Amino acid sequence: AINQALKIEAPKFDKKKFEKAVDYALTLTTQHGDFYPLIRKAFEDAGVIFVILPNLPGSGINGATKKIGQNVMLMVNDRRFYSDTVWFTLFHEIGHIINGDYGITFENEHAGQEDAADKYAEDKLIPPGEYEAFVRMNEFSENAIRRFAERIDRDPGIVLGRLQNDQIVPFTNVALSKALKHKYKVITS
């Protein structure tokens, strides 16, 4: 990832521009085909070099951030590249950048910085007040999840992934996962 990032010319990292690029990225969660080049360009304009790499089996690595000169590298891999995991991993790594901490994120790692990045991703992807109101309704059918996702302008797989992570909907509900989680295939060249 670092080698790829070093090949890319980008302006100096600008946190305010990056925050605007992050808000733009949120608008792309329902665009399954072309989001990567759009986000990559918006981030690059803010000094963040966004790289997607193939998974290294057995590594347990989901993503990483690193300061490289005057830029920041943001890497995610294509492991479990479904709508819920790709967007959560991306926004988790964005959380590290916004919080000013950099490094590698391993699966099932929980510490202060990791928890803060998780919270950032959760709150950016699904507004907390709206999520709490949706959960209180206690209706988690495919249609209910789709309606809520449409209302907050997010991919329904993101909502389902959050419900599963919060142990509200079981991961064993394969039919719901197949119906709502989009599988991405990103061409990175």
Give the positions of each predicted feature:
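Active-site hotspot residues in diverse enzymes, especially metal/ion-binding acidic/histidine motifs
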Residues: 1-189
